[in-house]
């Protein structure tokens, strides 16, 4: 997958204020407020910035944390990660591998088979429902 690079000014023009704050500035939406927190529609969640596929609904589960949670991405190559020491703690930030959009964080307290919990902002995602036929 080719890397997609745009300036912050271009992203600011392309995205809503909320998406820009979360995806490009590393913000976080309020818990239990996101569009996809409680949805159970079958499909694939894509990056809201570049449309890269990130998570399948088959890997989504209710972690009770207030954000959509997944136990694995569609492919390991879909995401990148880096250490995040903000807010006086250490976490692992998760980003879209194609455009470096901030998605959320990954924690080692998820269910089998991976034991991981990808805690993702709804604003960084777009759900493409599976076709009925």
UniProtKB/Swiss-Prot annotation:
Cofactor: Zn(2+)
Catalytic machinery residues: 119
Organism of derivation: Azotobacter vinelandii (strain DJ / ATCC BAA-1303)
Record keywords, A-Z: Metal-binding, Oxidoreductase, Zinc
Annotated InterPro entries: Met_Sox_Rdtase_MsrB, Met_Sox_Rdtase_MsrB_dom, Mss4-like_sf
Binding residues for Zn(2+): 47, 50, 96, 99
Protein name, entry field: Peptide methionine sulfoxide reductase MsrB
Enzyme Commission number(s): 1.8.4.12
A biological process term (GO) from this entry: protein repair
SUPFAM superfamilies: Mss4-like
Gene Ontology molecular function, alphabetical: peptide-methionine (R)-S-oxide reductase activity; zinc ion binding
Database matches in PANTHER family: METHIONINE SULFOXIDE REDUCTASE, METHIONINE-R-SULFOXIDE REDUCTASE B1
Similarity comment text for this entry: Belongs to the MsrB Met sulfoxide reductase family.
Gene3D superfamilies per record: Peptide methionine sulfoxide reductase
Annotated MsrB domain residues: 8-130
Catalytic reactions of this protein: L-methionyl-[protein] + [thioredoxin]-disulfide + H2O = L-methionyl-(R)-S-oxide-[protein] + [thioredoxin]-dithiol
